[in-house]
Amino acid sequence: MKMLNPQKPRLERRIAGSTNRWRFPRQPFSGDLLGLSQMCKAANIDFDEVLKNPDRLCISQIQKIFPENLKNKTIQSREADVILECLGFKWELHQPQLFQSETLAKLYLMGLARGNANPEKESVKILQAQQPGRSREQRPVKINDPLVTREAFATALKNLYMQEVKICLDDVLGVLAAAHILQFGSLFQRCVTVMMSGLTPSTIKNFYLAGCKYKEEPLTTACEKWMEMNLVPLVGTQIHLRKIPKELLHKVLKSPRLFTFSEFDLLKTLLLWVYLQLNNKTQTFPMYQTVLMFFSSFPKNCAFLDRDVGQNLIPLFLCLRLHSITKGKDLEELRHINFFPESWLVRVTANHYHALENGGDMAHVKDLSTQAVRFGRLFNQEYTTHSKVITLYGFFFEIKGIKHDTTSYSFHMQRIRHTDLECASTVYENTPISLRAERLVTYEIRAQTTVDGKWQEFRTNQITQKFGLAEPSCKSHALKIQTVGIPIYASFSFVFSLS
């Protein structure tokens, strides 16, 4: 930074405190605790804070040192007070705008503080000094962040002079990085807001990593929440799935709020992610059959997760609820690709046999929030009703969403007879049928949507109910909601409790 300075060269040392202890202003903390204490007292700066961060000696009292009429002073001429040199370019800036950026304010104050006992008066002198021939002091600003381009930095500086400059989604990462370097707090938060409202499969990775880099918890939380809802229905259908960081994926898989159409759909999404990690030259989204053929091509003497390449992926697949996959065709497919260790599949099969022998009782499930069977429906604008029939251990249920008016919805589940199904023979072909009149079920219904960029969540309590085959016992409690948000992510989690 080049600052226009009308002063003559002066001695570097100056007196601080009543004991006339000499200090060097370029070194805020030289080890002289007594002198530092006296200087903090004279400047009305917290001593403990300066010990933690000596740079606060330069910028912590900006608002007190400079009167409001200077900070709000309009630009009187085209001549700049400061020339900032960075990124191979010179930027002309004016003093009233500098104090929105802590970095620029710090550099400016360091120049003013050189041998000067009254920075407030000195600031007035510098502002009034418009004559040519002024000496220049150079303080370079080094920017090593590759995200900060000239365009992004120019946008950040433009925000010093103009309110609400439009920030394009394509440029927001660079502007965020520039705002962080400049310590331009209001602009940084504006960028965070733009990013939180602009989450898509193509932006989620970079926005999440930016949140982690700058420790911006609201941004990382927004990314995690968005992924919980969109991993299976949206990201899991696009090539951008490859870019999802493993850490983020693990957090999402562990979340009890994760939305999926079924456990098998979640498994397919995860298999696709692994395939894309191992085939990073693939430019198009693969067919699921291609993924199955790839994993089937490995030697059969060892399951994929037992291989060196699969060992670090085990924590991801431990998050799956494999006991929720009950269709014989799906289980046979998992055996064929030789992906899971044999012990995992044996345990799943044993649990299924035990449940069938005991009328559907799921003795292996202890916690509804982390082990329940889960199904989901994505309720879009065009739907008035949206339902799906599911089968589990010989019992048939319909999960259903109903739109009552433009903002009113309800969601429930209902036990049905297998003979009531349309095309019944195709639905329960090779499927056991239970003749039990009642089935004890513990369940929870949840609906989530966004309104003005903020998530709304509705849910029932955990309810235990005996489901019969006739009304009213065949129907669950209904989750009734009022919202303008679309789409609505409706999740049904349930366990067949011990009878």
Curated annotation (Swiss-Prot):
Residues 143-199 form the BTB domain. It comes from the Eukaryota. InterPro entries: BTB_BTBDG (IPR056426), BTBD16 (IPR042833), BTBD16_C (IPR048859), SKP1/BTB/POZ_sf (IPR011333). Transmembrane segments: none annotated. This is BTB/POZ domain-containing protein 16. It comes from Bos taurus (Bovine).
